[in-house]
């Protein structure tokens, strides 16, 4: 109740009109610091880019998602490519969902958000691992480590969104910004076929500023396709009932 009251108090701070925020911002320009608190509790969306060492946090404004801020990733491990097994020291790539049970405010790495690895895609391929997180302390063994100041703000907005009714926060993790030029640069990579499954999700958000709807069909990621009874959506396939975090 105290947490909910805090978010409500933040949202009631006198401020400029919401329409003004919409007209003065774009999906690629971070929102001014003085306006951030006005958006506390709004739905959010996360994109991570390994090669650029960047976490982008977006907030819903009207019908689309705008860039709240970009945060430098202190550290991740294992280079490009998806995590496949416990102990390979790699950080995951793919599409994940975070629910309230995956938040750890008292982590030994300051604060932590369990991304939900392995998801339905990972399990379909026999990938395994646990405790894969976005956390503070700038130390990583398969996780995405942020500065404490960075994870503080990310954690605050993710918590606020979930407290105010967002069922889960989507986290899209890419090896790099999936432009055509970057895809061509990596076309001979061992992981090229896997990355081609991720690119439609990246492209969809670039074009619409809305998170992609991601499903798994025959062990492959499929973006924005009509669902049938055979399709497993990652958020429905989560086997987390308690927070699996450090």
Question: PLM ranges: what are they?
Answer:
Residues 1-4:
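Positively charged n-region of N-terminal signal peptides that target proteins for export
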Residues 6-11:
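Sec-dependent N-terminal signal peptides
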Residues 28-45, 57-58, 75-87, 91-100, ...:
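N-terminal post-signal-peptidase region of extra-cytosolic proteins
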Residues 61-76:
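Short Gly/aromatic-enriched secondary-structure transition segments
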Residues 87-244:
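Exported/periplasmic cell-wall-interacting domains
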């Amino acid at each position: 109740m105290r947490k909910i009251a805090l978010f409500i108090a933040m949202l009631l701070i006198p401020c400029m009109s919401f329409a003004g925020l919409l007209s003065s911002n774009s999906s690629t320009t971070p929102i001014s610091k003085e306006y951030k608190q006005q958006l506390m509790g709004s739905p959010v969306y996360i994109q991570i880019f390994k090669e650029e060492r960047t976490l982008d946090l977006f907030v819903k404004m009207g019908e689309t998602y705008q860039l709240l801020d970009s945060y430098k990733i202190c550290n991740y491990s294992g280079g490009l490519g998806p995590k496949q097994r416990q102990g390979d020291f790699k950080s995951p790539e793919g599409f994940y969902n975070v629910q309230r049970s995956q938040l750890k405010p008292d982590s030994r790495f300051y604060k932590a958000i369990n991304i939900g690895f392995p998801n339905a895609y990972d399990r379909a391929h026999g990938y395994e691992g646990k405790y894969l997180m976005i956390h503070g302390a700038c130390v990583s063994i398969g996780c995405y480590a942020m500065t404490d100041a960075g994870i503080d703000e990310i954690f605050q907005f993710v918590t606020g969104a979930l407290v105010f009714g967002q069922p889960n926060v989507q986290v899209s993790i890419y090896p790099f910004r999936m432009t055509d030029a970057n895809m061509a640069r990596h076309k001979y990579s061992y992981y090229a076929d896997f990355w081609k499954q991720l690119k439609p999700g990246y492209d969809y958000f670039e074009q619409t500023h809305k998170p992609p709807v991601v499903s798994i069909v025959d062990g492959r990621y499929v973006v924005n396709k009509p669902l049938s009874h055979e399709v497993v959506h990652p958020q429905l396939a989560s086997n987390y009932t308690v927070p699996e975090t450090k």
